[in-house]
Amino acid sequence: MQRVVILDGPDNCGKTNIGKELSRQTGITYFKNQDEHKYFLKDPEYFVHAIRYVDTYFTSYLESSGASVILDRAWPSEWIYSKALGRKSDLGVLEELDRRHAALGTHIIIPYRTDYSRFKDDYDQVNDNIKKIHDLYMDFSVWTKCKVLKMNVDDEDLDREVKEIREFIDA
């Protein structure tokens, strides 16, 4: 059975640790784009190009192959960060990706915290907008047609988090 899981949430919520452990336990390939930080400030257009050309291409691959994957950030990040940081985006492509991923049965996991004050990101733009980013993730969870699990990670209990995700994606 195909499993497409997207871990997407505010910075410093443990997405990478959760994704790697979920991959270890399920055998589903984990993927994180290592280039996103290279372009975050230098070329904001990178992200709109990524959703237009890379994410649509990769979604076609998922549709035709039946492959399973755990993605550490994906197109939902563009929905949130373009709004939070005032970047140009392409809502039409985001709507298309959402529709196609809903048809795939994609599960989106949004880890979040009740307090972000102890955590600092590498980018001041993120630190200055963390409350807005959090709120936009909550808005996204209502907007998307995909299955969404909003998961509080204040306790940083990786075993509980992965167990909760596994129960959600297996339901």
Per-segment meaning from a language model:
Residues 125-171:
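NTP-dependent small-molecule kinase module
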Residues 71-74, 90-121:
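Conserved phosphate-donor/acceptor-positioning beta-strand/loop module used by diverse small-molecule
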Residues 1-4:
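Pre-Walker A (Motif I) flank of P-loop NTPase domains
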